[in-house]
Amino acid sequence: MSIEGVLKEGFVTTTADKLINWTRTGSLWPMTFGLACCAVEMMHAGAARYDLDRFGVVFRPSPRQSDVMIVAGTLCNKMAPALRRVYDQMAEPRWVISMGSCANGGGYYHYSYSVVRGCDRIVPVDVYVPGCPPTAEALVYGVIQLQAKIRRTNTIARQ
């Protein structure tokens, strides 16, 4: 967070947008939507070696408690309505990370009749993490990119 001015009396001045976005970046609560082998790498990122908790990322079991959805793996046509329903149950503001080649564009199963060719056809995606499967470091980098995107957004509507 960039602080515009620090006065000699001990006051800190900043904008409400930057303060709100700073608090949001420090408390991302993802709901895991693990569909295939990418979910294993997502579990590695949450474990002790990579420790997403140090970035304020706490995995939540319910969509009503989370503000980030990590779609990891192959999205089938039958699973697409459930993905959209879970996304709609999340509170605003909400963000989506698409993890892996299958979630990004169908991956290895791109030409299969039963696979959605990218979860961005169902829900709006904010960050794409490439790889098959992407490493836990790639997911950590994706979370950092999402935090940077949140810092750049305007929270309060301006006329």
Swiss-Prot record:
It comes from the Bacteria. It is found in: Cell inner membrane. PROSITE patterns: COMPLEX1_20K. SUPFAM superfamilies: HydA/Nqo6-like. Its main location: membrane. Binds 1 [4Fe-4S] cluster. It holds the Pfam family Oxidored_q6. It catalyses: a quinone + NADH + 5 H(+)(in) = a quinol + NAD(+) + 4 H(+)(out). Transmembrane segments: none annotated. Its EC number is 7.1.1.-. Its cofactor is [4Fe-4S] cluster. The keyword RNA-binding does not apply. Signal peptide: none annotated. It is a peripheral membrane protein. One of its GO terms (cellular component) is plasma membrane. Belongs to the complex I 20 kDa subunit family. NDH-1 is composed of 14 different subunits. Subunits NuoB, C, D, E, F, and G constitute the peripheral sector of the complex. This is NADH-quinone oxidoreductase subunit B.
